[in-house]
Swiss-Prot record:
Residues 38-42 are annotated as: G2. The lineage of its organism: Bacteria, Thermotogati, Thermotogota, Thermotogae, Thermotogales. The keyword Membrane applies. Transmembrane segments: none annotated. InterPro entries: G_ERA_dom (IPR030388), GTP-bd (IPR006073), GTPase_Era-like (IPR005662), KH_dom-like_a/b (IPR015946), KH_dom_type_2 (IPR004044), KH_sf_prok-type (IPR009019), P-loop_NTPase (IPR027417), Small_GTP-bd (IPR005225). It comes from Thermotoga petrophila (strain ATCC BAA-488 / DSM 13995 / JCM 10881 / RKU-1). This is GTPase Era. One of its GO terms (molecular function) is GTPase activity. PANTHER family: GTPASE ERA, GTPASE ERA, MITOCHONDRIAL. Residues 121-124 are annotated as: G4.
Amino acid sequence: MSIKSGFVALAGKPNVGKSTFINVVMGRKVVIVSDKPQTTRNRINCIYTDRDSQIIFVDTPGIHKPLHRLGEYMVKAAVQALKGVDLILFMLDAADGFTKTDEHVAKIVSESGTKTIIAVNKIDVAGEEKAKAVGQLAKSMVENVVSVHYISALKGEGVFEVLEKIKEELPEGPQYYPEDMVTDRPLSFMAAEIIREKIFHLTRQEVPHSTAVVIEEIKDRPNGVLYIRANIYVERDSQKGILIGKNGSMIKKIGTLAREELEFLVGRKVYLDLNVKVKENWREKDFIILQEIGLKDDIK
């Protein structure tokens, strides 16, 4: 039996709701979500399968003006993800209006020559009139637009209409992945992302953006517990102090929340060993950490 299948890249500036959209479609959390911009750093393939389709959503970092080498890698990974896909889902934030960054993303999307669906998110916040103005501006700047939709990813409104349109536009093809597979990323990547999400939720200002999580070891213990050891890198001693907290209170909270989610993910007990280390200016200079968190691999 033939199915509709293919790759769909999500494009947009930071914090427009790309990861929330994917999690709603998947019916579970596959990618981390935060109200802070630039939460997603890597290109992540999320695999949606039903009885007549398989859609590989390529969730990308938001396209923005980079301030350091980490930012450069993130933007290059996002732009590269638009090449060779079957369809682009270009997402915008209705509440923000149509910004200069949106204009920049629209140009990149248009130059790709790929069929594009536009989804204007946060219509529940901005209202229909403002959302439609954003959608029409975006449509006027992008070649090959097949449809424009107005959605609230957070509330799930309009999301499945977009999903049906994606299925309609995809070609008939093979099932690329087993039907029970939801991402092509390994456990080490998922563990690092879960830890990083808790840091984003619990810390403020520059601390979460200055943080890298590197999984050093994952092993099964004889008692059935999964042991995970992770290093959390920051750029300054003051950031290390914030992450550890008074009498270790913050790192304990991060560890507890991450461990609980990891146990749900793997279906058994987890021992999570977190260590905070300082690597000055790692986002600009430390190629080893950039390699470890996967960004250099994403743009080869």
